Amino acid sequence: MTSRPRSRRAVNLQILPSSMTVLSICAGLTSIRFALEHQPKAAIALIAAAAILDGLDGRVARILGAESRMGEEIDSLADAVNFGVAPAVVLYATMLSTTPVGWVAVLLYPVCVVLRLARFNALLDDGTQPAYTREFFVGMPAPAGAVSVIGLLALKLQFGAGWWTSTWFLCIWVTGTSMLLISRIPMKKMHTVSVPPHYAAVFVAMLAIFAAAVVLAPYLLIWVIILTYLCHIPFAIHNQRWLAAHPEAWDDKFKQQHDARRAARRACPNRHAVPRLGLLKPGSRSMVRSGLRKPGRRFI
């Protein structure tokens, strides 16, 4: 009797990451509908929402311990829809529907996204890769490719028609993005980038500017992100080549991080883990009140 509330709650938490992935697919597909109805701003917003959900579902799964092979496959399929099919159809419906050449470019992009995702999944199971490769993507990741393609529509919404809306420029840009997706150029994983403590204040200030730009100039912000990402590629190539020549440097960095975490734990030996998601701590008074434990009885 006492175990039913806990088991029901555990099941609900286990399906949360997959639910977020399904919601991201719905957002990506709905962006196509708004593009066909000539509402490009709503289409861009929905693709952005799909990207946010895609970035959160994996982290939520790790926090809840709900990682599974099925979840990985759903996430990969969601990336193909949200960052491959949806941006291509949105761009075609809003800017390239008047020319057959545009359709060729639009076909090329999602095909390259699928090939890139297939290679990513294959590399996950490859245990022969050096340890330092964990810090890099092989080729442009699918979300970055989607931002690059949608950035073309953002230019039109910000500045109107111009050479940046011409068919030749659109096709060249989409083709270039597609080639970056399937290339073997190393690109840094953003979650591996750490901010030094003495730059913490600068980082917080930049976050404030970013938040203001989301509201005041979202389309210009998209291009700031695109250009910043493209500019980081030469540094990522140099960093990857240096690590390939000095793999012991990555091992030393990992060891230093491990030692720092261990030193922090030793500095606070009596520190208690912070309970997450409101889960009740065994032996707490709240469990006695809720009927999950009898007073005076310990869990074994």
UniProtKB/Swiss-Prot annotation:
Location within or outside the cell: Cell membrane
Record carries keyword Lipid biosynthesis: yes
Annotated keywords: Cell membrane, Lipid biosynthesis, Lipid metabolism, Membrane, Phospholipid biosynthesis, Phospholipid metabolism, Transferase, Transmembrane, Transmembrane helix
MF-aspect GO terms: CDP-diacylglycerol-serine O-phosphatidyltransferase activity
Transmembrane parts of this sequence: 10-30, 74-94, 95-115, 135-155, 162-182, 207-227
InterPro entries: CDP-alcohol_PTase-I, CDP-diaglyc--ser_O-PTrfase, CDP-OH_P_trans, CDP-OH_PTrfase_TM_dom, CDP_ALCOHOL_P_TRANSF_CS
Primary localization class, coarse: membrane
EC numbers: 2.7.8.8
Catalytic activity: a CDP-1,2-diacyl-sn-glycerol + L-serine = a 1,2-diacyl-sn-glycero-3-phospho-L-serine + CMP + H(+)
GO biological process: one example: phospholipid biosynthetic process
GO CC terms: plasma membrane
NCBIfam families noted in UniProt: pssA (TIGR00473)
PANTHER family: CDP-DIACYLGLYCEROL--GLYCEROL-3-PHOSPHATE 3-PHOSPHATIDYLTRANSFERASE-RELATED, CDP-DIACYLGLYCEROL--SERINE O-PHOSPHATIDYLTRANSFERASE
Protein name: CDP-diacylglycerol--serine O-phosphatidyltransferase
Species for this entry: Mycobacterium leprae (strain TN)
High-level lineage: Bacteria, Bacillati, Actinomycetota, Actinomycetes, Mycobacteriales
